[in-house]
């Protein structure tokens, strides 16, 4: 975030030259969005040596399948755990009295569908959150710029997509900062939302990410569109998702 406290620890700087997939290279001070570049910020991760002994045990995120319009108890208990322990993390909106759906997408690579998704969202006048890795951003700057200019959230999904529980807290900060630096420099953009690669987290990781000013965003409904063996057509996909809302 813009208000992150300074630190003397080494952090990852953005690449001096972006990887381009469009027209001529950007000139100094230009961005893909047409916005002014944002100043870089230093990230100060709290308790870098984890002297408090927060658990580093790896958890694979589970959410359970909702039924009859009610979220699964697993998702409910996940959110209670986050709130009880003071973690800046969301998997379920427990505040709203309305029936609200938040659309989120993980973008670790491009497979030709993102532009179509953006077309549909624009047609339906819906905004969403796209959690992107640095390679996705560098290789598809026009798509990322479109997300930003059409008022979607481009969330931080790390530089190299590692399992965060296997990293030190300083390494976690560098993964997040490297992505944020690039967005600030070449897109004039930053957003304080993070998604753990592969949904793998630990108590220490939740705490570290929160100390950087980021909210960790999980989910309570999902469809395995990444598994090609499970695809049975758009009607099946639609009915599966709708039955879990």
State where each predicted segment sits:
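Metal-dependent polysaccharide deacetylase catalytic core of the NodB/CE4 family, i.e.
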Residues: 99-101, 111-113, 117-118, 122-237, ...
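N-terminal pre-catalytic segment of deacetylase/amide-hydrolase enzymes
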Residues: 2-104, 110-116, 123
């Amino acid at each position: 975030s813009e208000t992150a406290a300074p630190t003397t620890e080494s952090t990852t700087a953005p690449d001096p030259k972006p990887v381009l997939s469009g027209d001529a290279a950007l000139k100094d001070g230009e961005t893909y969005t047409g916005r002014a570049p944002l100043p870089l910020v230093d990230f100060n991760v709290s308790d870098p040596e984890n002297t408090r002994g927060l658990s580093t045990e790896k958890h694979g995120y589970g959410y359970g399948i909702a039924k009859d319009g009610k979220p699964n108890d697993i998702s409910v208990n996940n959110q209670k755990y986050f709130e009880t322990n003071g973690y800046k993390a969301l998997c379920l909106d427990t505040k709203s009295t309305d029936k609200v759906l938040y659309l989120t997408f993980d973008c670790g690579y491009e497979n030709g569908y993102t532009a179509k998704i953006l077309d549909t969202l624009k047609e339906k006048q819906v905004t969403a959150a796209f959690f992107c890795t640095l390679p996705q951003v560098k290789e598809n700057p026009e798509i990322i710029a479109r997300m930003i200019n059409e008022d979607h959230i481009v969330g931080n999904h790390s530089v190299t997509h590692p399992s965060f529980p296997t990293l030190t807290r300083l390494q976690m900060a560098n993964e997040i900062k490297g992505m944020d630096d690039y967005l600030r420099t070449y897109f004039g953009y930053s957003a304080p939302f993070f998604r753990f690669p592969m949904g793998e987290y630990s108590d220490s990781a939740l705490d570290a990410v929160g100390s950087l000013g980021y909210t960790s965003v999980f989910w309570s409904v999902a469809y395995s569109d990444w598994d090609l063996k499970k695809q049975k057509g758009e009607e099946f996909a639609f009915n599966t998702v709708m039955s879990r809302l």
